[in-house]
């Protein structure tokens, strides 16, 4: 019967000697993270394999693409002895997922992921991060597109290559998030991470063309892409938020995030200067003439777009689909199609800057706990619930 079979399995497991895990000893400072070089899929995999030997993090596969390439996530894992209950951690501290390279020709976010990870593992200010935040990095989501893009840029290293924007089937696969069965299997990575970590915040690091382009005059471009004729800023962002009054607290957190990002970027003279220069050009040659086609919402010398929706269980953005779980869904955009060399590094540093200040905001957040202890019909009932959203301050 079942009990006999279970007993046999238990006996075999008891007779199996425990595997001794080799201690991790590699330092991230000794890994070549290619901070000034465009990272293709092969280089990404080499870095991932080395990161598996670095203490303080857990590197694990989250999906396999349509063509068989692997997607990985990096979790900054607390160093506890014994069993680590993720359920209890989620009830105690917030979670953030930082996704990179969803569109493969938007190249700087992969560099930024590895550069950010290095700072988080080596700087004293982040020593307590694993105790205050569940942080997960996905350095390269669109692995098939990245492989295609890397081959194309060998001949034309600064072209935009929108042909490599999507996956190997030419699909915008974010529309397949939260589906249990999809041919666009790379979409399962975000779905699995979301189910496991229930993130309070989703940050998706993207990019836009790094120079003027002519496609909007070709007669076949959709209206949405005409707006990208001219770079508007080194870095700008989108906040996807719900309008429902019961989730007003979510909007408040988004506004604080807008503020701290603007202050952080203003602290870097080179980034601030490019933001000022490009936004002035965009205003003169685009927004001032056709504000509907070329919108721009200015705040502290930054441009941000606020995209409101009613809560919708079928929406692709988690802040709209599950607003009681995800407080913020933020899309960053740097002008990196296709960036190379020192300019690529600058774009990556812009991503790192806004990622860092957001992480610091969450580390300093106040979490409201609902703790209950009751007795009912001779049974003791206890609960320990972290209420969302968290409380953040400027």
Residue positions per predicted region:
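Single conserved hydrophobic/aromatic residue that forms the stacking wall/gate
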Residues: 1-6, 10
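Acidic/histidine-rich, surface-exposed loop or edge segments in extracytoplasmic proteins
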Residues: 12-34, 98, 236-244
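Soluble metallo-hydrolase cores and metallopeptidase-like ectodomains found primarily
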Residues: 35-89, 93
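Divalent metal-coordination and catalytic microenvironments
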Residues: 68, 101, 137, 203, ...
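Active-site/substrate-binding loop(s) of hydrolase catalytic cores
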Residues: 90-95, 108-111, 115-250
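Conserved beta-strand elements of the Class I
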Residues: 95-98, 330
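C-terminal or late-domain output modules
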Residues: 161, 172-175, 345-394
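Active-site-adjacent mobile loop/cap segments within catalytic or ligand-binding domains
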Residues: 211, 221-243, 273-370
């Amino acid at each position: 019967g079942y009990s006999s079979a279970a007993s046999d399995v238990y006996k075999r497991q008891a007779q199996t000697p425990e595997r001794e895990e080799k201690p991790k000893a590699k330092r991230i400072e000794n890994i070549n993270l290619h901070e000034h070089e465009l990272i293709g899929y092969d280089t990404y995999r080499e870095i991932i394999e080395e990161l598996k030997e670095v203490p303080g993090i857990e590197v694990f596969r989250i999906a396999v693409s349509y063509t068989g390439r692997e997607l990985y996530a990096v979790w900054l894992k607390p160093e506890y002895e014994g069993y680590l209950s993720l359920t209890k951690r989620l009830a105690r501290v917030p979670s953030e997922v930082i996704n990179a390279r969803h569109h493969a020709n938007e190249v700087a976010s992969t560099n930024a992921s590895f550069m950010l990870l290095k700072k988080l593992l080596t700087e004293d200010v982040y020593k307590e991060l694993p105790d205050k935040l569940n942080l997960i990095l996905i350095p390269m989501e669109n692995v098939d597109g990245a492989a295609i893009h890397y081959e194309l840029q060998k001949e034309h290293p600064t072209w935009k290559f929108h042909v490599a924007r999507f996956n190997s089937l030419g699909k915008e696969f974010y529309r397949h998030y939260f589906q249990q069965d999809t041919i666009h299997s790379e979409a399962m990575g975000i779905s699995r991470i979301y189910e496991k970590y229930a993130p309070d915040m989703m940050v998706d690091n993207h990019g836009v063309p790094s120079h003027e382009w002519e496609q909007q005059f070709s007669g076949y471009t959709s209206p949405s892409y005409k707006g990208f004729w001219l770079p508007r800023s080194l870095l700008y962002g989108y906040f996807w938020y719900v309008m429902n009054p019961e989730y007003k607290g979510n909007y408040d957190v988004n506004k604080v995030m807008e503020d701290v990002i603007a202050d952080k970027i203003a602290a870097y003279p080179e980034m601030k200067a490019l933001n000022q220069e490009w936004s002035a050009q965009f205003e003169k040659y685009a927004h001032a003439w056709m504000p509907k086609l070329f919108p721009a919402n200015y705040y502290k010398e930054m441009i941000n777009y606020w995209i409101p929706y009613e809560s919708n269980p079928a929406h692709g953005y988690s802040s709209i689909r599950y607003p009681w779980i995800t407080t913020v869904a933020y899309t960053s955009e740097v002008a990196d199609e296709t960036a190379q060399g020192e300019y690529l590094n600058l774009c990556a540093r812009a991503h790192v800057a806004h990622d860092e200040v957001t992480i610091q905001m969450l580390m300093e957040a106040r979490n409201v706990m609902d703790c209950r202890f009751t007795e009912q019909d001779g049974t003791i009932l206890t609960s320990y619930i972290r209420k969302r959203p968290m409380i953040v301050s400027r």
